[in-house]
From Swiss-Prot:
Function recorded in the entry: This is one of the proteins that bind and probably mediate the attachment of the 5S RNA into the large ribosomal subunit, where it forms part of the central protuberance. In the 70S ribosome it contacts protein S13 of the 30S subunit (bridge B1b), connecting the 2 subunits; this bridge is implicated in subunit movement. Contacts the P site tRNA; the 5S rRNA and some of its associated proteins might help stabilize positioning of ribosome-bound tRNAs.
InterPro entries attached to this UniProt entry: Ribosomal_uL5, Ribosomal_uL5_bac-type, Ribosomal_uL5_C, Ribosomal_uL5_CS, Ribosomal_uL5_dom_sf, Ribosomal_uL5_N
Similarity remark: Belongs to the universal ribosomal protein uL5 family.
Cystine pairings recorded for this chain: none
Organism: Desulforamulus reducens (strain ATCC BAA-1160 / DSM 100696 / MI-1) (Desulfotomaculum reducens)
Any one GO molecular-function label of the UniProt entry: tRNA binding
Subunit structure: Part of the 50S ribosomal subunit; part of the 5S rRNA/L5/L18/L25 subcomplex. Contacts the 5S rRNA and the P site tRNA. Forms a bridge to the 30S subunit in the 70S ribosome.
Source species, domain of life: Bacteria
Keyword tRNA-binding carried by entry: yes
GO biological process: translation
Record's keyword terms, sorted: Ribonucleoprotein, Ribosomal protein, RNA-binding, rRNA-binding, tRNA-binding
Listed name of the protein: Large ribosomal subunit protein uL5
GO cellular component: ribonucleoprotein complex; ribosome
């Protein structure tokens, strides 16, 4: 069993039940899925950028990403409907817990001048989205082999009904939120 899943079952669930007064264990919010997305604006001119981003995402997550395509043509961006403009991976189950554990404990501490992540990016329905400026913070990515520094969006989808429940869930799981002083 993944270390983070074990922590969730043994520490986080009982704490959340006590704090929010849940009567049933099934009411306790849990992490449902994690979606990692890399938007590729440069893919319009450079089609090799897609392959590089797919390779990076595959190394980071251990799962083959799908490519996302443009829905509409936009002349100002020289974009046609159906062109590949990004890649994304949806992680669930064991892989999700392993990735989140690596993100919190290995990757985020490698960010320069890291003080924690903002707790303002909740969407009102218990989901949290954060952005990373570079893929180099993951130990699976070798500095010499990347062609371009790319950022990514990471969305944590929870079963929480409110942002307060989701914030508490993620805090107990070990997400390093900025300390408000």
């Amino acid at each position: 069993m993944a270390r983070l899943k074990d922590k969730y079952l043994n520490e986080v669930q009982p704490n959340l039940m006590q704090k929010f007064g849940y009567k049933n264990i099934m009411q306790v919010p849990k992490l449902e899925k994690v979606i990692i997305n890399i938007g590729l604006g440069e893919a319009v001119q450079n089609s090799k950028a897609v392959d590089a981003a797919v390779g990076d995402l595959m190394a980071i997550t251990g799962q083959r990403p799908i490519t996302t395509k443009a829905k509409k043509s936009i002349a100002a961006f020289k974009l046609r409907a159906g062109m590949t403009i990004g890649t994304k991976v949806t992680l669930r189950g064991e892989r999700m817990y392993e990735f989140v554990d690596r993100l919190f404990n290995v990757a985020l501490p490698r960010v320069r001048d890291f003080r924690g992540i903002s707790d303002k990016s909740f969407d009102g329905r218990g989901n949290y989205t954060m952005g990373l400026k570079e893929q180099l913070i993951f130990p699976e990515i070798e500095y010499d082999k990347i062609d371009k520094v790319r950022g990514m969006d990471i969305t944590f989808v929870t079963t929480a009904k409110t942002d307060e429940e989701a914030r508490e869930l993620l805090k107990l799981m070990g997400i390093p939120f900025v300390k408000v002083s």
